[in-house]
């Protein structure tokens, strides 16, 4: 395994660890999820470049589209929750409430 792959895997696991540690705040969780998507994008790009297959080149682009949709939905939810409740604490949200 090359040093670049090791660094990218470490970045992914640190983002995953950050998601587990900072799960009480929605903004911190969204930032860690974006870090995870960025490392997955870099890993898929490196895999596509090493495989020399033209079909593999579409996977990073599709992943970027899903990451952009995830970021937009996450920021919209964050804005709605912070306007409604005044905070981004996940513990204050009751998802069973209608």
Curated annotation (Swiss-Prot):
Catalysis: reaction(s): a ubiquinone + NADH + 5 H(+)(in) = a ubiquinol + NAD(+) + 4 H(+)(out)
Membrane topology annotation: Multi-pass membrane protein
GO terms of molecular function: NADH dehydrogenase (ubiquinone) activity
GO terms (BP aspect): ATP synthesis coupled electron transport
One matching Pfam family: Oxidored_q2
Coiled coil: none
Protein EC: 7.1.1.2
Cellular component GO terms held in the UniProt record: mitochondrial inner membrane; respiratory chain complex I
Keywords annotated in UniProt: Electron transport, Membrane, Mitochondrion, Mitochondrion inner membrane, NAD, Respiratory chain, Translocase, Transmembrane, Transmembrane helix, Transport, Ubiquinone
UniProt cross-references to InterPro entries, sorted A to Z: NADH_UbQ_OxRdtase_chain4L/K, NUOK/Mnh_C1-like
Transmembrane segments: 2-22, 29-49, 61-81
Keyword NAD appears in the UniProt entry: yes
Keyword Transmembrane: yes
Compartments, as annotated in UniProt: Mitochondrion inner membrane
Superkingdom per UniProt: Eukaryota
Primary location group: mitochondrion
Similarity remark: Belongs to the complex I subunit 4L family.
Self-association state and partner proteins as the record states: Core subunit of respiratory chain NADH dehydrogenase (Complex I) which is composed of 45 different subunits.
Role, per record: Core subunit of the mitochondrial membrane respiratory chain NADH dehydrogenase (Complex I) which catalyzes electron transfer from NADH through the respiratory chain, using ubiquinone as an electron acceptor. Part of the enzyme membrane arm which is embedded in the lipid bilayer and involved in proton translocation.
Protein name: NADH-ubiquinone oxidoreductase chain 4L
Organism per entry: Calomys laucha (Small vesper mouse)
């Amino acid at each position: 395994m090359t040093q670049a792959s090791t660094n990218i895997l470490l970045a992914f696991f640190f983002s995953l660890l950050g998601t587990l540690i900072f799960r009480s705040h929605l903004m911190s969780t969204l930032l860690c999820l974006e870090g995870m998507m960025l490392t997955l994008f870099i890993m898929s790009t490196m895999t596509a470049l090493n495989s020399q297959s033209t079909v593999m080149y579409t996977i990073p682009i599709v992943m970027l589209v899903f990451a952009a949709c995830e970021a937009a939905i996450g920021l919209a939810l964050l804005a709605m929750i912070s306007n409604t409740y005044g905070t981004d604490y996940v513990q204050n949200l009751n998802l069973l409430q209608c």
